[in-house]
Design a protein with these regions (language model features):
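HhH-family (HhH-GPD) DNA N-glycosylase catalytic core used in base-excision repair
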Residues: 1-162
Length: 162
């Protein structure tokens, strides 16, 4: 059984009634693969700290997405940054959150999806996905560096190296 088949098996066998208050609960609000990818990435970025705070932050973001996370990010403009004024999470600053969405917009428009960004740095012959995850994080850190000239500690925490 390859990795994809193994993950699919566990995904189908998982009892979703026990999901809440896990951040993964937010992925199940969407059906479109690109929306699920976006919400999955966002949930993973904000999934640390107090469970209630994680849930509150993700609810605020999901509300901003207005039911279309991928479309929200694809069409995001710097002028939309004020929508994140009230969103802070642990040690992510408001500026970190704004820059995150600027970069997500840039990279999704360049590569078409989160999946494509991941696949660009993933080698199917690798024994596990560690290098793929590492390359994914490096891709975003490099994009932040190219766009903003420096990378805050908050941004580095969003895209850690395994």
């Amino acid at each position: 059984m390859n990795l994809k088949q193994n993950l699919e098996y566990h995904y189908k066998a998982f009892d979703r009634t026990k999901l809440e208050p896990d951040p993964l609960q937010f992925l199940h609000m969407f059906k479109d693969e690109v929306d699920i990818e976006v919400v999955g990435l966002i949930a993973s970025i904000f999934a640390y700290g107090n469970v209630k705070q994680i849930e509150n932050t993700l609810k605020k973001l999901i509300t901003l997405f207005n039911g279309k996370p991928f479309s929200f990010i694809k069409n995001f403009a710097a002028k939309d940054s004020q929508k994140f004024a009230a969103i802070k999470h642990q040690f992510y600053s408001e500026d970190d959150v704004k820059k995150l969405f600027v970069i997500l917009n840039k990279e999704i428009n360049r590569h078409k999806s989160i999946k494509q960004i991941f696949l660009q740095g993933y080698n199917i012959s690798d024994p596990n996905v560690k290098n793929g995850i590492s390359n994914f994080s490096k891709h975003f850190i490099n994009s932040f560096n190219e766009t903003f000239g420096n990378v805050s500690d908050g941004i580095k925490f969003m895209f850690p190296l395994p």
